[in-house]
């Protein structure tokens, strides 16, 4: 099944743009830039969108302008309008359980406490079987510090690692369309920025 919608999760507004919780949007922004397809605000989809062609496949890009916990509103609207099935969607999000410098593809699973994923699962009819790109941001080490951590900006050294992982993820996304998910996954999962 080809991917028809790539989503980058984020909170809207300049004050959140550089926070760890917006790592998914950094990836979609990079894809849009690499493929010369600038994102434009499209109110009916509650987000910034663009249309790209990857290996002959028509793909939509989406960065919701809702707050993170309402991401499903944007994803659901676009999936419904274009008749896109959950397994044709790739959602990029920040991942506490991976260190900065690592990104991994995954199909399905729970939301792991991520409010963006939780809302998307709910708005897709409680179907969790969409693809994810998990962008490692690391963990603060204490559950009570998670909210402040994801809404904080990474130090320059960590930002560099996250950016490198996102670059590799963008290259591997293009590889996925060229040579399949298995090859793309194998390459991405052996990458670790130094």
Swiss-Prot record:
The record marks 11 as: Discriminates between blocked and unblocked aminoacyl-tRNA. Pfam families: Pept_tRNA_hydro. It is an enzyme of class 3 (hydrolase). GO terms for molecular function: peptidyl-tRNA hydrolase activity; tRNA binding. It is found in: Cytoplasm. The keyword rRNA-binding does not apply. One of its GO terms (cellular component) is cytoplasm. The record marks 94 as: Stabilizes the basic form of H active site to accept a proton. The active site is at 21 (proton acceptor). It comes from the Bacteria. Its main location: cytoplasm. InterPro entries: Pept_tRNA_hydro, Pept_tRNA_hydro_CS, Pept_tRNA_hydro_sf. Its EC number is 3.1.1.29. Disulfide bonds: none annotated. GO terms for biological process: protein quality control for misfolded or incompletely synthesized proteins; rescue of stalled ribosome. TRNA binds at residues 16, 67, 69, 115. Monomer. Hydrolyzes ribosome-free peptidyl-tRNAs (with 1 or more amino acids incorporated), which drop off the ribosome during protein synthesis, or as a result of ribosome stalling. Catalyzes the release of premature peptidyl moieties from peptidyl-tRNA molecules trapped in stalled 50S ribosomal subunits, and thus maintains levels of free tRNAs and 50S ribosomes. This is Peptidyl-tRNA hydrolase.
């Amino acid at each position: 099944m080809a991917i028809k919608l790539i989503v980058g999760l984020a909170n809207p507004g300049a004050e959140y743009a550089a926070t760890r919780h917006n790592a998914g949007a950094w990836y979609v922004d990079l894809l849009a830039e690499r493929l010369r397809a600038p994102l434009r605000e499209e109110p009916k989809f509650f987000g910034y969108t663009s249309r790209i062609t990857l290996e002959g496949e028509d793909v939509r890009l989406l960065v919701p302008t809702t707050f993170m916990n309402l991401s499903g509103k944007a994803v659901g609207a676009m999936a419904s309008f274009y008749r896109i099935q959950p397994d044709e969607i790739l959602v990029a999000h920040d991942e506490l359980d991976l260190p900065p410098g690592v990104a991994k593809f995954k199909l399905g699973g729970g939301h792991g406490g991520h409010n963006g994923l939780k809302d998307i699962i709910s708005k897709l009819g409680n179907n969790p079987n969409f693809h994810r790109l998990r962008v490692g941001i690391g963990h603060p080490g204490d559950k009570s510090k998670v909210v402040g951590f994801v809404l904080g900006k990474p130090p320059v050294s960590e930002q560099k690692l996250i950016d490198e992982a996102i670059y590799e993820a963008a290259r591997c996304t293009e590889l996925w369309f060229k040579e399949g998910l298995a090859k793309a996954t194998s390459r991405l999962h052996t990458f670790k920025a130094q």
